């Protein structure tokens, strides 16, 4: 983590697929509230699509200079169907009956449902931030540079990626690539954090 920084200029070199897979696996293993993992990660490397995303992301060049762009998208709401699907899969993997989760599921839904869809979307979005942080740490472990991004127009990106009707909304962008030392003003700056 001392090595990583928010890379300002990437050189376009491709990140090997095994490193991309490692980073994605870190997002999959990320903790989430009640283990629901209410998000997924889209991987984009098509240059024409990245050009369109750059326009939506306030013309940040890392979007087109990166090797792969990770787009984090989160559930727009918690539903019985979604929660059941995750819990049923979990029980199947553990060789246990689905009914083992019935009381817990009912409790979650009784708490979440009255809070409304805006709360649901916000809560799911926060879970994607945890996975986002795991991806950044995993990338640093692999010596892959990243630029964490919230700076983009979510609704326009959702439209471009045709997320309407899928139950997902975009939350974060994470370009992956390699720094271009000679053209990155931040690369040699001292890393500074507030004191302990």
Enumerate the language-model features and the residues they cover.
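An N-terminal domain-cap segment
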Residues: 3-37
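A glycine-rich helix N-cap at a beta->alpha junction
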Residues: 62-76, 163-183
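Small-aliphatic-rich amphipathic alpha-helix that forms the alpha element of a beta-alpha
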Residues: 23-29, 70, 106-160
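Glycine/small-residue-rich phosphate/adenosyl-binding loop
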Residues: 42-126
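C-terminal helix-cap and adjacent tail motif
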Residues: 1, 6-7, 169-196
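Short helix-capping/linker segments at secondary-structure and domain boundaries
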Residues: 78, 139-145, 181-183
């Amino acid at each position: 983590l001392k090595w990583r920084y928010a890379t300002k200029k990437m050189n376009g070199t491709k990140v090997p697929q095994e490193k991309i897979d490692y980073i994605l696996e870190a997002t999959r293993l990320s903790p989430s509230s009640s283990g629901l993992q209410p998000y997924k990660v889209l991987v984009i490397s098509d240059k024409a699509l990245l050009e369109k995303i750059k326009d939506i992301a306030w013309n940040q060049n890392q979007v087109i200079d990166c090797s792969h762009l990770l787009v984090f998208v989160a559930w727009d709401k918690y539903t019985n169907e979604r929660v059941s699907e995750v819990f049923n899969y979990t029980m199947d993997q553990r060789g246990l009956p689905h009914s083992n989760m019935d009381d817990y599921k009912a409790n979650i839904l009784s708490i979440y449902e009255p809070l409304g869809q805006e709360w649901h979307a916000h809560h799911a979005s926060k879970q994607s931030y945890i996975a986002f942080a795991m991806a950044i740490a995993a990338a640093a472990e692999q010596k892959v540079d990243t630029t964490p991004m919230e700076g983009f127009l979510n609704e326009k990106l959702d439209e471009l990626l045709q997320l309407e009707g899928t139950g997902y909304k975009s939350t974060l962008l994470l370009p992956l690539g390699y720094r271009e030392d000679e053209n990155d003003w931040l690369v040699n700056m001292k890393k500074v954090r507030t004191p302990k």
